[in-house]
Amino acid sequence: MQEAPELTSAAEPASEAWRANEEAHRALVEELRGKLAAARLGGGERARARHTARGKLLPRDRVDTLLDPGSPFLELAPLAADGMYDGQAPAAGVIAGIGRVSGRECVIVANDATVKGGTYYPMTVKKHLRAQEVALENRLPCVYLVDSGGAFLPLQDEVFPDREHFGRIFYNQARMSGAGIPQIAAVLGSCTAGGAYVPAMSDEAVIVRNQGTIFLGGPPLVKAATGEVVTAEELGGGEVHSRVSGVTDHLAEDDAHALRIVRTIVSTLPARGSLPWEVVPAVEPKADPAGLYGAVPADSRTPYDVREVIARVVDGSRFAEFKAEFGQTLVTGFARIHGHPVGIVANNGILFSESAQKGAHFIELCDQRGIPLVFLQNISGFMVGRDYEAGGIAKHGAKMVTAVACTRVPKLTMVIGGSFGAGNYSMCGRAYSPRFLWMWPNAKISVMGGEQAASVLATVKRDQLEARGESWPVEDEDAFKAPIRAQYERQGNAYYATARLWDDGVIDPMDTRQVLGLALTACANAPLGEPQFGVFRM
């Protein structure tokens, strides 16, 4: 990309708009940091004190000890379950992410026993499964740091019986091991009931003496079922499983020892294959990423040139734009991020037929050349109206949606503003299986905006009343609309979305480049498949 033109910023740092944008974004980021700090504490001071009193490392200290010194950790869904379960499950009681262990990128899943004993709420299951999905798609070894009491029994109907519930964790382990994706477990505490299958179905397993326990039925269940009285250590401790049952392969003296053993295991894994694309030395953007706060309006309804974002994310701020004069409400082009080649698809307004055709064409190009795609989403949807329907906007939009769905290259999505309606589909929303998807704190996501939804439903009701010869006073209509607006505002919020794992996390806009770079490095572990496009309606 060294020959690509260098983007320059037209934003004015001295302007009132810049100052207002910056102030708004800083307030949003401050809120984000507060939420993240609270989630990182886990189950609270007393729970942490009990945990460490038993000689255990805290869950995040376990992850830090496992990782290569000084290496980054790309955490997944750190605010899962935010505001759910009466605030009793910060981060859904599990830490998940991608980190480097003995030089290899691995997916790490660490139970947080300070949160309800590490039991699995519905969102805990969803987060664990999401981490496994990331491992499968990117062919990353899995390391499970187990310290869990199993399913959260009061919500068993939302945790146990269905396809994407607790049992899917072990199904995934079996399938990934069969596909040559290593599965490694360290039992650092309880490993109860179905959870016992995590180490039992791993390629290699470590257990800590006098601390780790594995059993399908714990001492209370054994006593109730058989009358036998037995301690947890006698039933399923480290000595039993390392010397007698053979469920585990390594016996450690403490957490630190267990994590050293895991690092040794990872160091014995075969080297990964060649990279699927060329990676060159990274170059910092010429435009300062800190300028994202001022250059980008916090309100997604305010128009701006998305090249202001691209300039602050890509290497050297260099961007080889594709079809710059056609379909100008969609910006497409080639760049590099941390040395990785990328094709960027970025909203610059509402989607018309021309911009949808341009997007489909560009995605096909990237697929043909084996270049990962980065989607920068800020979209209110497709243009509507009689002329546009007659012009075939449905079939043109379908071309772009088909291209997004069928491309074989990794797709990374960043929601930097609004994500509404069919625009979400064309710009690789969660339903289109991006390898990763993040949101900025100002992002909004819903089938349409709250005002539009309220107006649509009010129009339907007004038509019904008029058909019966009844009137509808303005004040009654306003009262009807108000709760609809409030519902959409609440449910479209970035934190409502991330709590339910509709994304992989809410991030500081300034971290966009770093997050994308780490994700691209993870994606480079998996080979590209074969092109496989469906029918494009002409």
Predicted regions and their residues:
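Ligand-binding clefts of soluble mixed alpha/beta catalytic domains
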Residues: 1-538
